[in-house]
């Protein structure tokens, strides 16, 4: 069937280009909306007590310091701490009350490739049972795909040592 349709296709014999390219009138330039915020960490409220923090692309086996702002949450007071069930790959460094809400600083370890979600719970010091769930979502690239452009609020603080079994000094048993 592909051979039957082959003769019916129209062919372009020539291509004509515009003689002048003005910056204002050119249709080939890409223009972005001024209101786009693609280079910052995005915080979205999923429910009354849950927030999703999207930190963009990260590189595997690297540690990152992530700073973001949570909006004012009525369930939290000024004395905020992490609940005693910590994550292995996400560690809370500080929570500071600011006029816009809370400035949260944490350290994230990109331990495997893919879209990863790590969770931490923030609670009040006063002993109330209210807590806020913060889910940090990252897209972790493997080491062969280059270095990602980090969003504002994300800073690389170190790389984990990579274990490669081919370069082992161990000679085995005698």
UniProtKB/Swiss-Prot annotation:
It is found in: Secreted. GO terms for biological process: adaptive thermogenesis; glucose homeostasis; positive regulation of non-canonical NF-kappaB signal transduction; positive regulation of protein kinase A signaling; positive regulation of transforming growth factor beta receptor signaling pathway. The modification Phosphothreonine is found at residue 147. The keyword Transcription regulation does not apply. The keyword Acetylation applies. One of its GO terms (cellular component) is extracellular space. This is Adipose-secreted signaling protein. It comes from Bos taurus. The gene is ADISSP.
